[in-house]
C-alpha cells in the first residue's frame, strides 16, 4: 500500500503549474486532495480533470491573503475528511523589477502573498498536522537562498520563507511535525500565471533587460519539469527530509556565498 493511501493533503496555488503537478502526484499515490486557488474557474477545471478514475480532488476557491478564506479552506477540509496529513504552501508569485524601482508598497504586496499568506495557512494547519505527525511543505526558491538581479521584492520574500521554515523545523520538529523547505530553480510551464503574466512580460519592468524576463530571471539552467519536482517532493516527505534543492548543484553556490560572497556575486552576475 502507498504511504499516501487515504491521507489528506491541501495544496495552495493548486490550480496550475507546480501546484497542479503536486496535487496530481498526491492523487496518483492514493491521497485525498484539496486544491486551493483564487482563480476559481481554472480551479474547477483542474479538479474535474484530476478527479478521474475514482480519485478525489476537492476544489476550494480561496485567497491566502484573506484570513476568512483561509479559515473557510481548513474548516471545509476538516469537516469533509476529519483530518489533515499534509499542507503544501505553493501559492505565490514572482516579479520583474529593478531593486531601486521596487517601492515599499511593492514589497508589502508581495510579502503579503508569498510570506504572510503562508504564515496564515501554516498556523491553521499546525494543530491538525501535529496530531498526525504530518508534513508541512513550503515552496521557496533558489532565490530564497541566493538573491538574483531584476526580480524586485521576490528574493526578500523567499528568504523570509526559508527562515520561517527553519524556525518551524527547529520548534515543531521535536513534536513530530515534518517540515520540508523546497528551493527549486525555474519551473517549466506552458503559460505564466494570470496574475503574474504582465509582470513577467516586462510591461511593468522598466529598465529590466530582456534576458531577465525569461523563467528564473534568465538564470542559465535547464527548466525543471513540474511533474518530476512533484514526485521528488513526495519522496522527500516520505523520507522526512529537511530540504530539497533542485538542481542539487546549487548547493555549491550557497556554500560559496558563506565563504566568499564577492566571488559568489560574480558567479551570479555571469550566470544570469
Where do the model's predicted regions map?
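SDR active-site lid
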Residues: 170, 174-248, 266
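Substrate-binding pocket helix/loop in short-chain dehydrogenase/reductase
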Residues: 70, 98-99, 103-108
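Residue(s) in the substrate-gating loop at a strand-loop-helix junction
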Residues: 141
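Active-site helix of classical SDR
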Residues: 122, 157
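Active-site loop immediately N-terminal to the catalytic Tyr-X3-Lys motif
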Residues: 100, 146-152
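Conserved glycine-rich Rossmann-like NAD(P)H-binding loop of the short-chain dehydrogenase/reductase
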Residues: 31-45
